[in-house]
Amino acid sequence: MLWLWLGLSGQKLLLWGAASAVSLAGATILISIFPMLVSYARKWQQMRSIPSVARAYPLVGHALYMKPNNAEFFQQLIYYTEEFRHLPIIKLWIGPVPLVALYKAENVEVILTSSKQIDKSFLYKFLQPWLGLGLLTSTGSKWRTRRKMLTPTFHFTILENFLDVMNEQANILVNKLEKHVNQEAFNCFFYITLCALDIICETAMGKNIGAQSNNDSEYVRTVYRMSDMIYRRMKMPWLWFDLWYLVFKEGRDHKRGLKCLHTFTNNVIAERVKERKAEEDWTGAGRGPIPSKNKRKAFLDLLLSVTDEEGNRLSQEDIREEVDTFMFEGHDTTAAAINWSLYLLGTNPEVQRKVDQELDEVFGRSHRPVTLEDLKKLKYLDCVIKETLRVFPSVPLFARSLSEDCEVGGYKVTKGTEAIIIPYALHRDPRYFPDPEEFRPERFFPENSQGRHPYAYVPFSAGPRNCIGQKFAVMEEKTILACILRQFWVESNQKREELGLAGDLILRPNNGIWIKLKRRHEDDP
């Protein structure tokens, strides 16, 4: 009997202890999340007056309405901006995170001109394992210092040195496309992307990886795999926690991919540092000029030389951050713009004829390389690229995390809100672009651009955090398009609704860009 009593008493004590532990854990969790709940409730109350796309529910917000498929979600977001275009801003709650969508020039200006609202969205943190805290992902004093150091490296006179690389890789691309002349329609997206990757590798790192000739190299495969994994992780909140992410195969693949990319970049940097040291030793020994190796200067060489106001140089980790940032930002966006240009020219033959006429005036029938003077003369092609970026901006939306309360469109928007700027919708404002779905490069003639709101068109963002590489991007786009269009006539029967637009960090066609090629001059070899 005593043993039974002791056993029952022991069980009660264990149950009481377990219950106490659970209660203590629950109380600890409640105490830790209580401030967040208070902050959430305050934001909910303060932002009640901002128009909402639909009824939001506490904690889950509008998540129940959101389409899980990426292409469908982007179309849903665009639908909201069209449905509520008469409103200055609209509000969405993604779980406990408030978002305001901005698609009117006067409201976009408020955010982009602010010297305080420069923090990128929290989603950019998923780029940090690869890019570190480089120019794209850093903020505050680090971003300001780094931006000031790097701006001179994008001066036009320096960019001119990269034109040879662009010409060489564009010619390789043209040769690759030859096999499709007078054949069935083909998907050109991957061809253009590999060309852009070759260009950014050689201009950023001074390394010719030959992606167009060997697209199965480990580095090339890892660059694309890493980009896809980052996009997917951003959309899946259950993968946001690092330790939990590593439980999944993709998390482990991500870790292996990072090692591959960082090892490659570190080796390139170390190799170039060693070469520079040998060059310094050679000249320091009084041996005269270094025997010419015909080695081109790359961004990497500039990064190894730049200093801040106090004369400090970038560390190897700093340099790797920026080189990797150039790699990430410098090929996908440019490749997308070129692909969209080919699609729009292929569906608008009257525009393509005007481009051909301009190319003939500048180049005649020659196949010589494109020069900087040629690029300056290609004014109509420049308008074609601008109009392409209006209709299909390479970056269809981007975000700022508000670092303080501000007023936008007559509404108070609280600190911590994600301000989503949507160039895809902004560029379709009929106040500034009548018949916005029509492709009209003439919109960007100087006489037609007068009086247009400066923030009605922001394909490269604007304000303090605008794209530092936009001149490089436009130079590359014009060079590649000029090389392709001097040789080929482009046709496309693909309808807009067949593209399958997906708005990740880059505006992509899920179904590819399908074109046909004909030789412009039948007597060409």
Curated annotation (Swiss-Prot):
One of the GO biological process terms: fatty acid omega-oxidation
Pathway this chain belongs to: Lipid metabolism; fatty acid metabolism
GO cellular component: endoplasmic reticulum membrane
Alphabetized GO MF terms: heme binding; iron ion binding; long-chain fatty acid omega-hydroxylase activity
Subcellular locations according to the entry: Endoplasmic reticulum membrane
Purpose of the protein: A cytochrome P450 monooxygenase involved in fatty acid metabolism in the eye. Catalyzes the omega-hydroxylation of polyunsaturated fatty acids (PUFAs) docosahexaenoate (DHA) and its precursor eicosapentaenoate (EPA), and may contribute to the homeostasis of these retinal PUFAs. Omega hydroxylates saturated fatty acids such as laurate, myristate and palmitate, the catalytic efficiency decreasing in the following order: myristate > laurate > palmitate (C14>C12>C16).
Official protein name in the record: Cytochrome P450 4V2
Organism: Mus musculus (Mouse)
